[in-house]
């Protein structure tokens, strides 16, 4: 056995076990402990120190290792079953949390492991020995027969956890648990790719999860996490891409019982590549245990089986967990339905290195789906290398029976035995790997420190019937290399007798350049003549269009018709067609509205109109495929129906036009011809039937005849018709032929129904379908409910057949539940989506879509949003034809449209402007001199007068006494007589009662205002123009983030033109706080004013004389003022209860005192299609309010019986989450994590106002203290989480708490204790503080995953995502007192308390 002698296993390995491990022959028996990769200190392993949270020093790698799309030169090994490319944070930051982690992680068994007191050991090393690399290569090639067929690793990194135990808080006198785990991770890489192997030997896993330290005594055990995480991308600050294999205890147990490459306990994954790799891709070559030699295994060997028992806590949505389905080549003798067994046989008459792993014919003991060479084609290793197995066989002779081998050091022995497995040949020569080895020993490859390794021969594969052998290029003409493979373009030489292929690599479409043409749920595969798309596991379709398996689907379309019904012509155009398909039992319902009555009645028997959807989405029997798996969402369906005996003939053409933005199929139907007349009182009855569909290239045909009956009372007539169907589509011609479906399939229609409702004007069809092989009449046999649709799975769940009539149900991707009841998952609210920066996630039923924000559009990959290049603006790029900048301004109207307007002081068309001579208009004082300047003018008082030129006074000084006056009083008294510069303003200072300067000074005649210091000096930058809000004489306001307006840009342009400081006689536009033109504009600092419109144009006839202001009307309508509604008298409630949000419903949970009355809990309101997150209650009008992130709305409903919901806000929302009601002021407040805003509005949705839109990253919870007028909210920004506060009108914003918090999800204010309390999903604590942030204390520090919290009486109640319930916590003791788990197990969001009265509290 391959163990370090210190491991305690002293039995030497046998030659048989060595060869078995080297050659890796798949079999269904579980992995034995001695079949792990060799490890131990004698193999060069390093030991990790004992402890609970240890990590290795950086292990420098010889060559960089690729992980996802990056390269790393060092690795770290941690105690807790994890490997990373960077040093680990403290274990409390990741060991008890679900994926994804914040750092890169490779986790074969992430749990709280403790090796203290010699409880196991952890070993790791980098290895380049040929034996280890060869074994890793064989695993990879087995699991990835296409993409990994030429994988030749050059380095491997091994980490082994041997007999390690879980962390335990052992009580005094109790012995530690004897449950110990052994598992191994191997990372094999070459220059281009990295593959990971996880190995779990039989009985190697004895514990399957650990209990979190912070809540160790709560009896909560977290299953081990197995998978990979890329880590947070620093440049994008988005959550990490990840792949998870486990989520429940059963899925952890499956690790050693199942496999994704056919060997129980061995799992393989493609985790890094220098080519595009959207996510980790698991191997998909699992076998079937029904033929396995292990009676203990009861589940299929498949990745899907390993992921059974999903729960919402760790549901891994398909966009985050894209599986690359590999299609292994199938030989002509493939075992039925893929069930196979691979055995190992040793040829005692041949070289001991020769091993037979051939593929046998069906029915033999060695039937295998993997195309290994036949026994006669296996390579014979050279004698010099074979002889090294035993020093006694110096000539390399075979070891005879009864001879005993003398084993030396295992490393030396395995290095000399190193070999690589031959790559599986492709039947269609799809991939041609470079030939660099042969049996003669030429071009042998040497592994470092391992000596030469036997080369692989090219194994000839017998051609299939009708197949043409490829003509390989001669030496020196090597085909181009792409993606680590040689890809050859093939061209037929028609008419050539030798029928050879030649190679043409020009213009070949490849995945690298065309991957965007595949569905987002598909992977792309290069073939010799091009590429094809294939849907991932758990999806079906043609690769270009993929839908989730088992999920319901919808079809929308239009129907037009030109019919003759009997002898009556009937026409109709573009009437609506809608179809609903229950995917997991093959039911298809079709409804066509607004068809004229005679035509609708006559079309009742024409079932193929809706029967198409039955064939498209039929329930598939094993080995069969429905229509959508073949055609995808683009095809043409032609039907010709001939009625008998009248020979009426009608033709139906249905054209599928792809999937719409909601992922629904769009179809256009046209009906033309003649149909028999059917009276209005007759109904049509169609018995179950079978149809045969024939498949060839890109055409499907079907021809059948059947009868139907028309009944009315006692009348029963039987008619018949003949149906010819033809379905054409575009198949991918590049895929190998062995991927084709059977030539003929049978569609069985168990139930058929047709009905026309004249009252509704709707024609309906319903069919229940299953498709499978052609059946031969025989005695009836039991059918698994999954195949005939009789199962009890939810309509959004997949049915997994088991043995006999047993089956299991699993919710399809995008839904959650136990399979018998599934609800939609909001990927947008939970963060499980791939929408990138500058995009918005929109939740759909069973899925989601990404929309670019305003000003952005999708790039070619349809995921990334890029900035839309703005249209040219002639006003900015200088292409306008306006007069020069100092004379006119350009006004942009969108696109390339603009207009020109002369500036004040100029007159003209805007394209040509001339100066206005203001002096000719006598605008100055009679004792002043006027000076005209381009675009303006100035006035100066004549000698002997003082003033600003518009007002001049005689230059005389009063003789009043000035003794005893303070500076403000002095300046105030003698303002008119102080020295004034030409054009200066006369301002009379304002003083307070003590004679000091009032901080806010305003010019009495012009309305200019500014701030002054204690000496009366103006504070720079505080002056405001007339008509605007006076400045707050304190700290300057925060800079605005909005774009500059025309007024602001014009003002800045003139200020720059004036050199930064305009004279008092120069005009500067006056703008309000929002950048709009103030209706009243004045010249310089004078009171010579006029009115302007919203674009700043002067309104003719509004200029005034000095001292008189024109009455200017604002161009923006004032806000509507509505009266506050009078509070109605509400009868007292019978008690207090809790309301909680749970996706599509609002739940009601009564309280008896502070105890939960769980038996009286019920659903208060069902809201189909909604995702209710935030919830609060208006105690004055007994109304409940909630936010809906699916509908992007805020709604309310009365608690009176029979009340209907009312939507009050329907626009301007992206992801409304937190909600708070102020019952005093009749207002509501909410957070929007999509827009990063906090808004307020009246309770009817009016008077909306954005309070904050800056310095917010992930705002969530919000609460209000209406008595004291304070607002509080949380922001769970991972880099800087915080709790903030402000007044209710948005003033005095400040950070209240930003230390020692992680993910503050829930927030509540207790009006009785005046405490602000929050529940933190990061620190797992419930804490409280006084409103000013002081007196902070911890109530409970062992929460699981809280989302929302509310306070009532002596308890807190919070919703919990780990328990999916409501948890109650005593305020005084901090103890958990009770919990309520709703019958429908899904995440609970917001929670609020409904009092029988309005709480008043005390100031």
UniProtKB/Swiss-Prot annotation:
GO molecular function, one term: calcium ion binding
Protein name as catalogued: Nidogen-2
Biased composition (Pro residues): 1027-1040
LDL-receptor class B repeat residue intervals: 1182-1225, 1226-1268, 1269-1313, 1314-1355, 1357-1401
Modified residues (Omega-N-methylarginine): 1336
Region described as Disordered: spans on this chain: 323-403, 1021-1043
Lineage: Eukaryota, Metazoa, Chordata, Craniata, Vertebrata
Cysteines joined through disulfide linkages: 511-524, 518-533, 535-546, 786-799, 793-809, 811-822, 828-841, 835-850, 852-865, 875-890, 882-900, 902-913, 919-930, 924-939, 941-952, 968-991, 1002-1009, 1011-1033, 1047-1071, 1082-1089, 1091-1112
Pfam families membership: EGF_CA, G2F, Ldl_recept_b, NIDO, Thyroglobulin_1
Cellular localisation: Secreted, Extracellular space, Extracellular matrix, Basement membrane
Feature: compositional bias, Polar residues: 386-395
Domain Thyroglobulin type-1 as annotated: residue spans: 965-1033, 1044-1112
Gene name of this polypeptide: Nid2
Superkingdom of source: Eukaryota
Organism expressing this protein natively: Mus musculus
GO cellular component: basement membrane; cell surface; collagen-containing extracellular matrix; extracellular matrix; extracellular region; plasma membrane
PTM annotation: Highly N- and O-glycosylated.
Domain EGF-like intervals: 507-547, 782-823, 824-862, 871-914, 915-953
Quaternary structure, from the entry: Interacts with LAMA2. Interacts with COL13A1. Interacts with EFEMP2.
Residue positions with a glycan: 386, 475, 681, 716, 726, 1152
InterPro entries linked to this entry: 6-blade_b-propeller_TolB-like (IPR011042), Cueball_EGF_LRP_Nidogen (IPR050778), EGF-like_Ca-bd_dom (IPR001881), EGF-like_dom (IPR000742), EGF-type_Asp/Asn_hydroxyl_site (IPR000152), EGF_Ca-bd_CS (IPR018097), G2_nidogen/fibulin_G2F (IPR006605), GFP (IPR009017)
Gene3D superfamilies: Green fluorescent protein, Laminin, Thyroglobulin type-1, TolB, C-terminal domain
């Amino acid at each position: 056995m391959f163990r370090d002698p210190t491991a305690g296993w002293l039995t030497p390995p046998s030659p048989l076990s060595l060869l078995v491990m080297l050659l890796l022959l798949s079999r269904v028996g579980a992995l034995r402990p001695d079949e792990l990769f060799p490890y131990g200190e004698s193999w060069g392993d390093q030991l990790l120190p004992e402890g609970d949270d240890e990590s290795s020093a950086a292990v420098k790698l010889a060559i960089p290792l690729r992980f996802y799309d990056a390269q790393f030169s060092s690795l770290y090994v941690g105690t807790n079953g994890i490997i990373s490319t960077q040093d680990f944070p403290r274990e409390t930051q990741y060991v008890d949390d679900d994926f994804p982690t914040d750092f890169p992680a490779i986790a074969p068994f992430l749990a709280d492991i403790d090796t203290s007191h010699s409880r196991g050991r952890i070993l790791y090393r980098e290895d380049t020995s040929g034996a280890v690399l060869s074994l890793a290569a064989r695993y990879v090639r087995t699991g990835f027969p296409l993409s990994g067929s030429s994988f030749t690793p050059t380095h491997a990194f091994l980490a082994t956890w041997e007999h390690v135990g879980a962390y335990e808080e052992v009580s005094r006198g109790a012995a530690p648990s004897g449950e110990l785990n052994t598992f191994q991770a191997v990372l094999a890489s070459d220059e281009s790719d990295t593959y990971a192997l996880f190995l779990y030997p039989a009985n190697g896993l004895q514990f399957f999860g650990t209990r979190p330290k912070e809540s160790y005594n709560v009896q909560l055990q977290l299953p081990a996490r197995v998978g990979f995480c890329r880590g947070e991308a620093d440049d994008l600050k988005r959550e990490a891409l990840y792949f998870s294999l486990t989520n429940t205890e059963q899925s952890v147990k499956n690790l050693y019982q199942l496999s994704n490459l056919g060997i129980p306990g061995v799992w393989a994954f493609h985790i890094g590549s220098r080519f595009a790799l959207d996510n980790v891709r698991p191997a998909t070559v699992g076998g079937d245990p029904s033929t396995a030699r292990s009676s203990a295994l009861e589940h299929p060997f498949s990745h899907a089986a390993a992921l059974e028992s999903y729960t919402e806590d760790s549901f891994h949505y398909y966009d985050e967990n894209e599986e690359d389905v590999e299609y292994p080549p199938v030989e002509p003798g493939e075992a039925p339905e893929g069930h196979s067994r691979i055995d190992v046989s040793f040829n005692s008459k041949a070289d001991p290195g020769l091993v037979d792993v051939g593929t046998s014919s069906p029915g033999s003991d060695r039937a295998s789906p993997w195309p290994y060479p036949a026994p006669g084609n296996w390579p014979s290793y050279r004698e010099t290398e074979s002889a090294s197995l035993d020093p006694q066989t110096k000539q390399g002779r075979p070891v005879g029976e009864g001879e005993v081998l003398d084993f030396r050091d295992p490393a030396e022995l395995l290095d000399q035995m190193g070999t690589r497995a031959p790559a599986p040949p492709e039947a269609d020569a799809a991939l041609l790997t470079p030939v660099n080895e042969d049996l003669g020993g030429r071009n042998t490859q040497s592994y470092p420190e391992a000596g030469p390794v036997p080369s692989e021969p090219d194994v000839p594969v017998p051609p299939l019937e009708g197949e043409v052998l490829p003509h390989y290029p001669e030496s020196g003409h090597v085909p181009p290399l792409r993606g680590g493979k040689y890809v050859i373009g093939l061209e037929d030489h028609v008419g050539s007798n030798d029928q050879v292929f030649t190679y043409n690599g020009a213009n070949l479409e490849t995945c690298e350049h065309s991957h965007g043409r595949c569905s987002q749920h598909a992977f792309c595969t290069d073939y010799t003549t091009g590429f094809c798309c294939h849907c991932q596991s758990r999806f079906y379709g043609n690769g270009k269009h993929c839908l989730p398996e088992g999920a319901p689907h919808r079809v929308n379309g239009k129907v037009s018709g030109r019919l003759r019904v009997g002898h009556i012509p009937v026409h109709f155009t573009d009437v609506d067609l809608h179809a609903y398909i229950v995917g997991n039992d093959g039911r298809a319902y079709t409804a066509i509205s607004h068809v004229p009555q005679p035509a609708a009645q006559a079309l009742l028997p024409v079932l193929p109109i809706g029967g198409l959807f039955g064939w498209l989405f039929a329930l598939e029997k094993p080995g069969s495929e429905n229509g959508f798996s073949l055609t995808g969402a683009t095809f043409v369906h032609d039907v010709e129906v001939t009625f008998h005996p009248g020979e009426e003939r009608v033709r139906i053409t249905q054209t599928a036009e792809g999937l719409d933005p909601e992922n629904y199929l769009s179809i256009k139907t046209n009906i033309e011809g003649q149909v028999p007349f059917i009276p209005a009182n007759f109904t049509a009855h169609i018995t179950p039937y079978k149809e045969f569909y024939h498949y060839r290239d890109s055409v499907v045909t079907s021809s059948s005849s059947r009868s139907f009956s028309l009944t009315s009372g006692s009348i029963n007539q039987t008619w018949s018709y003949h149906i010819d169907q033809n379905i054409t589509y575009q198949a991918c011609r590049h895929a190998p032929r062995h991927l084709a479906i059977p030539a003929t399939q049978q569609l069985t229609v168990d139930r058929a129904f047709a009905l026309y409702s004249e009252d509704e004007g709707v024609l309906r069809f319903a069919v229940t379908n299953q498709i499978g092989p052609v059946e031969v009449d025989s005695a009836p046999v039991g059918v698994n409910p999954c195949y005939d649709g009789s199962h009890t799975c939810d309509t959004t769940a997949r049915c997994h057949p088991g043995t006999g009539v047993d089956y299991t149900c699993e919710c399809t991707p995008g839904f959650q539940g136990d399979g018998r009841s599934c609800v939609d998952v909001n990927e947008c609210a939970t963060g499980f989506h791939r929408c990138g920066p500058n995009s918005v996630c929109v939740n759909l039923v069973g899925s989601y879509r990404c929309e670019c924000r305003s000003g952005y559009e999708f790039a070619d990959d349809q995921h990334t949003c890029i900035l839309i290049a703005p249209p040219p603006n002639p006003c900015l790029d200088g292409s306008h034809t306006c007069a020069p900048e100092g004379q006119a301004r350009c006004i942009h109207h969108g696109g390339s449209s603009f207009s020109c307007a002369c500036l004040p002081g100029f007159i003209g068309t805007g394209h040509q402007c001339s100066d206005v001579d203001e002096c000719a208009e006598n605008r100055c004082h009679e004792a002043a001199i006027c000076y005209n300047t381009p675009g303006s003018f100035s006035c100066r008082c004549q000698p002997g007068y003082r003033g600003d030129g518009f007002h001049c006074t005689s230059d005389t000084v009063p003789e009043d006494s000035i003794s005893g006056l303070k500076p403000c009083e002095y300046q105030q008294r003698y303002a008119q007589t102080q020295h004034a510069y030409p054009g200066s303003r006369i301002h009379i200072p304002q003083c307070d009662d003590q004679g000091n300067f009032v901080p806010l000074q305003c010019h009495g005649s012009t309305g200019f205002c500014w701030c002054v210091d204690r000496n009366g000096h103006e504070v720079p930058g505080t002056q405001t123009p007339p008509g605007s809000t006076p400045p707050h004489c304190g700290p300057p306001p925060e800079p605005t983030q909005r774009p500059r307006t025309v007024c602001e840009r014009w003002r800045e342009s003139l200020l720059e033109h004036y050199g930064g400081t305009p004279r008092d006689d120069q005009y500067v536009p006056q703008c309000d706080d929002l950048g709009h033109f103030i209706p009243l504009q004045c010249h310089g600092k004078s009171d010579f004013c006029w009115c302007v419109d919203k674009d700043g144009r002067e309104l003719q006839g509004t200029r005034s004389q000095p001292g008189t202001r024109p009455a200017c009307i604002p161009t923006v309508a004032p806000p509507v003022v509505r009266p506050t509604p009078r509070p109605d008298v509400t009868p007292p409630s019978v008690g207090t209860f809790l309301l909680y949000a749970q996706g599509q419903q609002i739940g009601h949970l009564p309280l008896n005192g502070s105890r939960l009355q769980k038996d009286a809990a019920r659903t208060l309101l069902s809201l189909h299609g909604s995702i209710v997150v935030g919830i609060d209650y208006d105690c004055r009008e007994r109304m409940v309010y909630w936010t809906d992130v699916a509908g992007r709305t805020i709604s309310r409903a009365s608690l009176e019986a029979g009340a209907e919901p009312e939507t009050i806000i329907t626009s301007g929302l992206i992801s409304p989450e937190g909600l708070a009601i102020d019952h005093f002021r009749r207002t509501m407040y909410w957070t929007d994590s999509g827009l990063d805003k906090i808004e307020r509005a009246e309770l009817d949705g009016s008077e909306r106002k954005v309070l904050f839109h800056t310095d917010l990253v992930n705002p969530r919870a919000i609460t209000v203290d209406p008595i004291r007028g304070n607002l509080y909210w949380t922001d769970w920004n991972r880099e800087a989480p915080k709790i903030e506060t402000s007044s209710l009108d948005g003033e005095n914003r400040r950070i209240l708490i930003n230390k020692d918090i992680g993910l503050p999800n829930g927030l509540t204010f207790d009006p009785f204790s005046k405490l602000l309390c929050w529940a933190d999903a990061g620190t797992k604590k419930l804490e409280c503080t006084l409103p000013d942030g002081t007196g902070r204390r911890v109530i409970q520090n062992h929460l699981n995953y809280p989302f929302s919290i509310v306070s009532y009486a002596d308890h807190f109640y919070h919703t919990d995502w780990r328990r999916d319930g409501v948890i109650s916590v005593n305020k005084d003791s901090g103890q958990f007192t009770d919990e309520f788990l709703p019958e429908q197990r899904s995440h609970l969001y917001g929670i609020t308390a409904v009092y029988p009265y309005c709480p008043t509290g005390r100031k």
